[in-house]
């Protein structure tokens, strides 16, 4: 977020000149923010409290990238080990997306449908990637090997539950989009889930890791 107050949603509302009756709020959850917003929006539509839900997200990697490069150039105490937590910062990209959700009954033309899903959480791994602001600006440090291992383990549990919930199997999806982290993550994930990597749709080679917008921007 560019600032603590007001909400980012208020700037979007003003720029688009939306109705005063429009409910606005920010929903933030690192790289899962857009997916969480889609589930919240879908629940509001199903409950009848909203007819149309506009989800907007933007990721600006420039500040983090610039601060990381500055620190790496200035901190002469860094060695081969202490520099590793900063590597992930150099893969960060920028992007923006907007998603409009509405009930399938309101759509006249064929559109992508949100069919369902499951939730799987491992908050014990929340220390493996931490970032924020300080007097030195925006910063982030990542234990990439441990985060990869924890993420693969969590994805295996999630995929097992998803297949049961949706009555899917490994051959059901025609296209597959994973979180856009990097090539090593991509290979290990497909191997762990026994999925066909030829169905993969990736953007990280061109856009980098675009965080919360990675999935929708790859669509």
Name each model-derived stretch.
Residues 19-23, 47-53, 86-87, 95-96, ...:
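Short coil/turn connectors at secondary-structure junctions
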Residues 1-2, 6, 19, 27-46, ...:
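Claisen-condensing/thiolase-fold acyl-transfer catalytic domains that form or cleave C-C bonds
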Residues 3-18, 64-78, 128-133, 185-197:
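Acidic-glycine-rich active-site phosphate/pyrophosphate-binding loop
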């Amino acid at each position: 977020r560019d600032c603590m107050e007001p909400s980012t949603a208020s700037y979007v509302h003003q720029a688009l000149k939306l109705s005063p009756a429009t409910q606005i709020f920010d929903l933030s959850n690192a790289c899962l923010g857009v997916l969480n917003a889609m589930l919240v929006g879908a629940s509001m539509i199903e409950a009848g409290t909203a007819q149309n839900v506009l989800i907007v997200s933007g990721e600006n990697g420039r500040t983090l990238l610039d601060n990381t490069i500055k620190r790496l150039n200035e901190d002469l105490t860094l060695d081969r080990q202490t520099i590793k937590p900063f590597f992930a910062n150099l893969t960060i990209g920028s992007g923006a997306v907007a998603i409009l959700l509405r009930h399938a009954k309101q759509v006249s033309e064929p559109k992508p449908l949100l069919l369902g899903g499951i939730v799987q959480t491992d908050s014990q791994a929340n220390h493996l990637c931490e970032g924020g602001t300080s007097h030195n600006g925006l910063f982030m440090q990542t234990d990439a090997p441990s985060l990869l291992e924890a993420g693969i383990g969590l994805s295996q549990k999630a995929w097992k539950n998803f297949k049961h919930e949706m009555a899917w199997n490994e051959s059901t999806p025609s296209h597959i989009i994973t979180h856009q982290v990097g090539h090593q993550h991509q290979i290990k994930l497909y191997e762990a889930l026994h999925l066909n990597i030829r169905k993969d749709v990736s953007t990280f080679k061109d856009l980098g890791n675009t965080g919360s917008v990675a999935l929708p921007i790859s669509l």
